[in-house]
Curated annotation (Swiss-Prot):
Protein name: Ribonuclease PH
Function, as annotated: Phosphorolytic 3'-5' exoribonuclease that plays an important role in tRNA 3'-end maturation. Removes nucleotide residues following the 3'-CCA terminus of tRNAs; can also add nucleotides to the ends of RNA molecules by using nucleoside diphosphates as substrates, but this may not be physiologically important. Probably plays a role in initiation of 16S rRNA degradation (leading to ribosome degradation) during starvation.
Annotated EC: 2.7.7.56
PANTHER family linked to this entry: EXOSOME COMPLEX COMPONENT, EXOSOME COMPLEX COMPONENT RRP41
Catalysed reactions listed for this entry: tRNA(n+1) + phosphate = tRNA(n) + a ribonucleoside 5'-diphosphate
Binding site for phosphate: 86, 124-126
The UniProt record lists the keyword tRNA-binding: yes
Principal EC category: transferase
The entry's keywords: Nucleotidyltransferase, RNA-binding, rRNA processing, Transferase, tRNA processing, tRNA-binding
Length: 238
């Protein structure tokens, strides 16, 4: 039995709230159960120096956790003077995932930065950030389209969403919360597009290796979860 009493293939309650920042061109507060992430998409009408005069744009991401997003207060990374390795790895993961569905040529020489700030963490912050980050990115492109800068459907080629899966007490389960994630035998993150393309898979065995059969079960769970997330994204931006 899962601590949350959910079925093995049952996700937490998922919600997207758009337009939560009056300053950002695009914003979304995404909730995966008790994991809450504020995603804002900000437009700059320039690109990094290494992309100048290419005619292409760029999408990047930054990630952070508020000090009391966890059970005990975390020290701000700014106070430490540098980002931790985990933060850098996660924000690169988010950026790669979002870029997988963006036509940089159609975007033109502009950069969109998607900031993902964890307000409350209960497992799956990176998957929530990718899924909510797509909604914020869509809202930013919609803002640009209203000003005749781009066409959303030309720039954004597809949906992208992410979900965690793992093996908890010998059973493959979908969308792990912290109570499960902290003791799971296997922990994986799956990123897929709306058309079913695989963007990235991160999978780790905690002590005991997992079998190809178990991986197949996790993949099946992930695909069903991402199908559901994409449906919710579509409703959120309709």
């Amino acid at each position: 039995m899962r601590p949350s009493k959910r079925a093995a293939d049952e996700m937490r309650a998922i919600s997207f709230e758009r337009g939560v920042s009056k300053h950002a061109e695009g914003s979304c507060l995404v909730k995966f159960g008790d994991t809450h992430v504020l995603c804002t998409a900000s437009l700059e009408e320039k690109v990094p120096g290494w992309m100048r005069n290419t005619g292409k744009g760029w999408v990047t991401a930054e990630y952070g956790m508020l000090p009391r997003s966890t059970g005990e207060r975390m020290r701000r990374e700014a106070a430490a003077g540098k980002q931790g390795g985990r933060t850098q790895e996660i924000q690169r993961f988010i950026g790669r995932s979002l870029r997988a569905v963006v036509d940089m040529q159609a975007l033109g020489e502009m950069q969109i930065t998607v900031d993902c700030d964890v307000i409350q963490a209960d497992g799956g912050t990176r998957t929530a950030a990718i899924t909510g980050g797509w909604v914020a990115l869509h809202e930013c492109l919609r803002w640009m389209e209203a000003r005749q800068m781009v066409r959303v459907e030309k720039v954004l080629k597809d949906h992208v969403a992410a979900i965690s899966c793992g093996i908890y007490e010998g059973v493959p389960v979908l969308d792990l919360d912290y109570a499960e994630d902290s003791v799971a035998e296997t922990d994986s993150n799956f990123v897929m597009t709306g058309k079913g393309g695989i963007v990235e898979i991160q999978g780790t065995a905690e002590g005991v290796p997992f079998s190809e059969e178990e991986f197949g079960a996790l993949m099946k769970l992930a695909r069903s979860g991402i199908d559901r997330l994409v449906s919710l994204q579509k409703m959120a931006v309709a």
